[in-house]
Regions:
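Alpha-helical transmembrane segments
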Residues: 14-18
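C-terminal motif of bacterial Sec signal peptides marking the signal peptidase cleavage site
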Residues: 19-23
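Bacterial N-terminal signal peptides that target proteins for export
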Residues: 2-11
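Domain-level detector for secreted/extracellular nuclease and nuclease-toxin modules, and
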Residues: 24-313
């Protein structure tokens, strides 16, 4: 993007955010990068005269229900254009220290739950392009994970509503090192559970999803494009279901091992239940504050425990 266009987008964003908080979802919808400040504010590092620019309050994307409390990473939002309107595809907080996402957040709702696009062709190279919003702070396209696979967080199958939406899930900022065994069996069971629930209008009006892996509790460190990158010891998911005025939440905590095997369909839900926990418990394990934009009383209630029956488990 040219300097002129970035500056124009920056001025537009300022105007919209000052005009009305309800309009701010239309700000910066092609996913430009912002640095999260310790006080929860952001600045656009590409804006002209950035040293003189006052931080912009994160009143927009950080206010969405799926967005966890931000830390000191790089906040990125990727959007697509659907039916002449912008649509948030997913968001993430990137850790430049680890060259991996701290988390990736997205939602299933009436606008994106349709399945109309196929998976990106394996013939397209790079298969996993560099995130265009990270520049030198991110990993290069198709950077090898040295024996580990590129494990999606926002899965390819999570975003089948358009070609652009699916393609964006292949950015290097949306993948973490996963063993082929884990990526092809155990993780798929949890991904499929989320996709089935997210695409069911009878189950949820909106299903909010956050996924990640542990960056400090690791199996090992590997060298990727000259950088030290951790291989998470655990992967996790945080889910929030909204149906009418009813809220329920659920967490998953799954060890990243190499010895998983395929299991019969009748054993999948019991296995998922064994790895389920409350959001409060997941927050303790990850150090991440999930769903902080819920009303306080709702947040306390839905995060304290989970109902297996509410999730069909």
């Amino acid at each position: 993007m040219s300097t002129y266009n970035k500056f124009a987008k920056y001025l537009t964003m300022m105007a919209v955010m000052l005009a009305a908080a309800t309009a701010c979802e239309d700000v910066d919808d092609d996913g430009d990068i912002f640095s999260v400040q310790p006080d929860g504010q952001i600045i656009d590092p590409d804006a002209p005269g950035v040293d003189e620019v006052s931080p912009i309050p994160l009143t927009c994307y950080s206010a969405r229900l799926e967005t966890p409390a931000l830390k000191d990473g790089i906040f990125i939002e990727h959007s697509t254009f659907e039916r002449d309107d912008s649509l948030v595809n997913y968001m993430l907080e990137y850790s430049p220290e680890h060259f991996l996402p701290r988390w990736v957040a997205f939602r299933f709702d009436a606008r994106n739950r349709a399945v109309t696009a196929n998976r990106k062709s394996y013939d397209i190279k790079p298969q996993f392009p560099a995130d265009p919003d990270l520049g030198s702070k991110g990993l290069p396209g198709d950077a090898s994970f040295n024996g580990f696979q590129h494990g999606h967080l926002c899965a390819s199958n999570d975003r089948r509503n358009s070609r652009e939406a699916n393609d964006q899930t292949f950015y290097m900022s949306n993948v973490m090192p996963q063993s082929g065994n884990f990526n092809g069996t155990q993780w798929v069971y949890f991904e499929s559970f989320v996709q089935t629930k997210g695409r069911s209008e009878s189950f949820a009006d909106t299903l909010y999803v956050v996924k990640g892996g542990t960056l400090d509790d690791v199996r090992q460190n590997i060298s990727v494009a000259g950088h030290t990158v951790p291989v998470p010891r655990y992967f996790w998911m945080a889910l929030l279901r909204v149906k009418g005025t009813n809220y329920s939440a659920l967490g998953f905590w799954v060890e990243h091992r190499d010895n998983y095997t395929e299991i019969p369909a009748t054993e999948i839900n019991p296995m998922i239940l064994e790895h389920s926990l409350s959001i409060d418990q997941l927050e303790t394990l990850t150090g991440i504050n999930f769903f902080p934009n819920l009303p306080d009383d709702v947040e306390r209630t839905v995060e304290a425990s989970f109902s297996a029956a509410a999730w069909g488990l």
